[in-house]
Amino acid sequence: MPKVALYDMSGAQVGEIELNDSVFGIKPNQAVMFDFVKMQLANKRAGTASSKTRAEVRGGGKKPWRQKGTGRARVGSSRNPVWTKGGVAFGPRPRDFSYRLPRKVRRLAMKSALSSKVLDNNIVVLDSLTFDEPKTRLMVQTLKSLPVGKKTLVVTAYGDPNVIKSARNIPGVKPLRADFINVYDLLNYDTLLITREAVARIEEVFA
């Protein structure tokens, strides 16, 4: 089972914590993580892009000139796609881009992302993370005392409101509750800063 250092809020190492091998110790599957991120980004798409066809563009009801006898090319509407101010041929229409990967694939992707953080030594586990009141300054001090990167994902077990409010205004820092942890954020942020309680919650769900 992988072991990582356990820190307190002052940045002092207070011991070690054993992580569940089936969640934090598997060989990361790059292809599955790619598929999951692709699904996440597709599901975020609004799908509202829309262009007008020749039938929907205003005007163009009258035939510009008669069919024969002018020497010009035959044309039925001044709003055909070839003309200026014409409609769009095969343009985007509103659609739903969302889809869902199988449950086992989603779980494997999450375990792979968590394991990659452990392998790359980009996980910092805190004994606890609590504030009496929301103060950005206190969160900044805590982050400065810990070995974290410029972009840090702060994960707590149940989304402590004081922690969320203290962290959400810091550039490059994203607070998250354990139930909302996802592959895209794990890969997008340099360091995973997670509480011991959140680790237990994740292991409870994915082990």
From Swiss-Prot:
Organism superkingdom: Bacteria
Signal peptide stretch: none
GO cellular component: ribonucleoprotein complex; ribosome
One example GO MF annotation: structural constituent of ribosome
Chain segments carrying region Disordered: 47-78
Keywords in alphabetical order: Ribonucleoprotein, Ribosomal protein, RNA-binding, rRNA-binding
Gene3D superfamilies the UniProt entry points to: 3.40.1370.10
Biased segments, Basic residues type: 60-71
Record-linked Pfam families: Ribosomal_L4
Example of a GO biological process term: translation
Similarity comment text for this entry: Belongs to the universal ribosomal protein uL4 family.
Role summary: One of the primary rRNA binding proteins, this protein initially binds near the 5'-end of the 23S rRNA. It is important during the early stages of 50S assembly. It makes multiple contacts with different domains of the 23S rRNA in the assembled 50S subunit and ribosome. Forms part of the polypeptide exit tunnel.
Self-association and partners: Part of the 50S ribosomal subunit.
NCBIfam families listed in its UniProt record: rplD_bact
Protein name: Large ribosomal subunit protein uL4
